[in-house]
UniProtKB/Swiss-Prot annotation:
Assigned keywords, A-Z: Membrane, Transmembrane, Transmembrane helix
Record field: transmembrane: 64-82
GO CC annotation, single: membrane
Gene: SMIM10
Entry protein name: Small integral membrane protein 10
InterPro entries: SMIM10
Topological type in the membrane: Single-pass membrane protein
Main location per the UniProt record: membrane
Length: 83
């Protein structure tokens, strides 16, 4: 959260809370589950890739959607999930 016109962030703990939430999500999603099926390795790779893109977007202060599209074009990463 940024104070209007100041260029400084309000509440220094927001960044650490977001990092802790992201770390917790990564740990929870990387745990093996009994009913993962044949897509287990793919889901793990997909999760790591999305978390990596989110982390880079967070560090560079960019919108995740635009960063994901740019990274997909540059790295030719196609994340397709069969539903």
């Amino acid at each position: 959260m940024e104070a209007l016109g100041s260029g400084h962030y309000v509440g220094g703990s927001i960044r650490s809370m977001a990092a802790a939430a992201l770390s917790g999500l990564a740990v929870r999603l990387s745990r093996p589950q009994g009913t993962r099926g044949s897509y287990g390795a793919f889901c793990k790779t997909l999760t790591r890739t999305l978390l990596t893109f989110f982390d880079l977007a967070w560090r560079l202060r960019k919108n995740f959607f635009y960063f994901y599209i740019l990274a997909s074009v540059i790295l030719n990463v196609h994340l397709q999930v069969y539903i």
